[in-house]
């Protein structure tokens, strides 16, 4: 069963050339990218004593904002996306800047072989796919035993609707209108339910909050009402 939502692909294909334009449609991702990157690296370093040979899978990599920066930090990254135009943009940037990322046009379910990775990353993707539970299970199957995953998405709350859609899309113009569908936002409890009866443990939920007074994004232990990270670990024994 495919995780691809054709309407979502068409929407992102129209702006796929803009991934590396900090003032363009993906400008907000450039603003939060440093804090996303730092969070990912912090979790990797806290989990693994030796990070020299780790293999990372970036699912739904877009134009390569995270994959590029992780590669520049010395990690071995495979990055996949369902849109060829996203992969083309990512490859063009990597080639121009002599950065070696293994980019592949693929969905998580189409990814060849049964290879597993030390770290699986999926940022701001799950709220754009079809068949979310199957997508999630395919995602965690790609984690090695004792490996980790970091996912980010948007909570389905009134606050998220007001800030993530009304404010971000229609008032502030941080992202294009109709980028998000409120019905596809995910509550943390729904992610817990998807992973029941598996060998996956949710270790941490961490909010990503805009501090209006200081005009910056910060991590929060308490506020997961809008944007949040899910940090997962995979046990040795279990179903997945």
Swiss-Prot record:
EC number: 2.1.1.222, 2.1.1.64
Residues in coiled coil: none
Pathway: Cofactor biosynthesis; ubiquinone biosynthesis
Spans traversing the lipid bilayer: none
Reaction equations catalysed: a 3-demethylubiquinol + S-adenosyl-L-methionine = a ubiquinol + S-adenosyl-L-homocysteine + H(+); a 3-(all-trans-polyprenyl)benzene-1,2-diol + S-adenosyl-L-methionine = a 2-methoxy-6-(all-trans-polyprenyl)phenol + S-adenosyl-L-homocysteine + H(+)
Keywords from the UniProt entry: Methyltransferase, S-adenosyl-L-methionine, Transferase, Ubiquinone biosynthesis
A Gene Ontology biological process term: methylation
Keyword Zinc-finger attributed: no
Enzyme class: transferase
InterPro entries assigned: SAM-dependent_MTases_sf, UbiG_MeTrfase
PANTHER family xref list: METHYLTRANSFERASE, UBIQUINONE BIOSYNTHESIS O-METHYLTRANSFERASE, MITOCHONDRIAL
Family according to the record: Belongs to the methyltransferase superfamily. UbiG/COQ3 family.
HAMAP family tied to this protein: UbiG (MF_00472)
Protein name per Swiss-Prot or TrEMBL: Ubiquinone biosynthesis O-methyltransferase
Taxonomic lineage: Bacteria, Pseudomonadati, Pseudomonadota, Alphaproteobacteria, Rickettsiales
Gene: ubiG
